[in-house]
UniProtKB/Swiss-Prot annotation:
Its EC number is 3.6.4.-. Coiled coil: none annotated. This is Actin. Its main location: cytoplasm. Belongs to the actin family. InterPro entries: Actin, Actin/actin-like_CS, Actin_CS, ATPase_NBD. Keywords: ATP-binding, Cytoplasm, Cytoskeleton, Hydrolase, Nucleotide-binding. PROSITE patterns: ACTINS_1, ACTINS_2, ACTINS_ACT_LIKE. It catalyses: ATP + H2O = ADP + phosphate + H(+). It comes from the Eukaryota. GO terms for cellular component: cytoplasm; cytoskeleton. Actins are highly conserved proteins that are involved in various types of cell motility and are ubiquitously expressed in all eukaryotic cells.
Length: 376
């Protein structure tokens, strides 16, 4: 099976959002929430044709009457039945095509358990009958998207943050570090500190409003204490936000206090090191000969790295941690929200990649464990 004659599909399954589209495109065709909703009460919606589940945006819009579940927790698939529903929705409702006609490239979190890779492979070949399949580590794809093959990727999405050093296209597993702190936690923290101001948000519907406030108004301070002092003396950083019901709220130092948790997870009651210290720790776990190249190729990816000011702050903190002669360079490409998907699109459309696919024939001969031989 050659991937030449037909477009390969690239699906990046994140904890918060699923990004899917065609290899060779410069952006995903569809982006929707990785969520499956089931009715809380049987038979309350007359004439709905009683669907037993809803996926993505439809689940979000009906969230008042549904129980929402995210099948991917902290980057790892934990509920395969729901995951299958998300893939089904991706192929048939979002992309509107027959999966048995297209090679599929999926992404996985670093350190994804072996059994998970096999299960993914099995579902793709046995349930969806894809002609060819490949699975790639998310951070490695982000690095490809930035035009590098060596560097260290700070990938922070909705459910998990990873620091992944990569040398000549291969990740260095012994130095990969994971922090269970990402976008969802920052949204929750913002809900908490807004409630101190007297604005209460509690339901899952209200959490979406706070996520929007976070995405539109939050930023990372270059000097946190200095910023706090400034904000207490003037109202220059105050911004107003209109809620769906027309009420207008004012948000001040919460704008930079929420993302500060990335650098000081202790404010969330977490023992973890911040993203700056974790990046440094990861570099120090690598061979002394590659460190210089890693310091000068620090690449940010994922939606949680989209805060204004984050690259400058990272530059400042890492320059302070690194040896004084070391050149620290942070790359934060504007399309980094989708750089995992973009990297997948680039990889799957390379002529040299076409012999890398696991074909249906190879799968039938060797079974799911073939994935460990062909995808690394």
């Amino acid at each position: 099976m050659d991937g030449e004659d037909v477009a390969a599909l690239v699906i990046d399954n994140g904890s918060g959002m699923c990004k899917a589209g065609y290899a060779g495109d410069d952006a995903p065709h569809t982006v929707f929430p990785s969520v499956v909703g089931r009715p809380r009460h049987q038979g309350v919606m007359v004439g709905m044709g009683q669907k037993d589940s809803f996926v993505g945006d439809e689940a979000q819009s009906k969230r008042g009457i549904l129980t929402l579940r995210y099948p991917i927790e902290h980057g790892i698939v934990t509920n395969w039945d729901d995951m299958e529903k998300i893939w089904h929705h991706t192929f048939y409702n979002e992309l509107r095509l027959a999966p048995e006609e297209h090679p599929v490239l999926l992404t996985e979190a670093p350190m994804n358990p072996k059994s998970n890779r096999e299960k993914m492979t099995q579902i793709m070949f046995e349930t969806f009958n894809v002609p060819a399949f490949y699975v790639s580590i998310q951070a490695v794809l982000s690095l490809y998207a930035s035009g590098r093959t060596t560097g260290i990727v700070l990938d922070s999405g909705d459910g998990v943050t990873h620091v992944v050093p990569i040398y000549a296209g291969f990740s260095l597993p012994h130095a990969i570090l994971r922090i269970d702190l990402a976008g969802r936690d920052l949204t929750d923290y913002l809900m908490k500190i807004l409630s101190e101001r007297g604005y209460t948000f509690s339901t899952s519907a209200e959490r979406e409003i706070v996520r929007d406030i976070k995405e539109k108004l939050c930023y990372v301070a270059l000097d946190f204490d200095q910023e706090l002092q400034t904000s207490s003396q003037s109202s220059s950083i105050e911004k107003s936000y209109e809620l769906p019901d027309g009420q207008v709220i004012t948000i001040g130092n919460e704008r930079f206090r929420a993302p500060e948790a990335l650098f000081h997870p202790s404010v969330l009651g977490l023992e973890a090191s911040g993203i700056d210290q974790t990046t440094y720790n990861s570099i120090m776990k690598c061979d002394v000969d590659v460190r210089k190249e890693l310091y000068s190729n620090i690449v940010m990816s994922g939606g949680t790295t989209m805060f204004p000011g984050i690259a400058e702050r990272m530059q400042k903190e890492l320059t302070a941690l690194a040896p004084s002669s070391m050149k620290v360079k942070i790359s934060a490409p504007p399309e980094r929200k989708y750089s995992v998907w973009i990297g997948g699109s680039i990889l799957a459309s390379l002529g040299t990649f076409q012999q890398m696919w696991i074909s249906k024939q190879e799968y039938d001969e060797s079974g799911p464990s073939i994935v460990h031989l062909k995808c690394f």
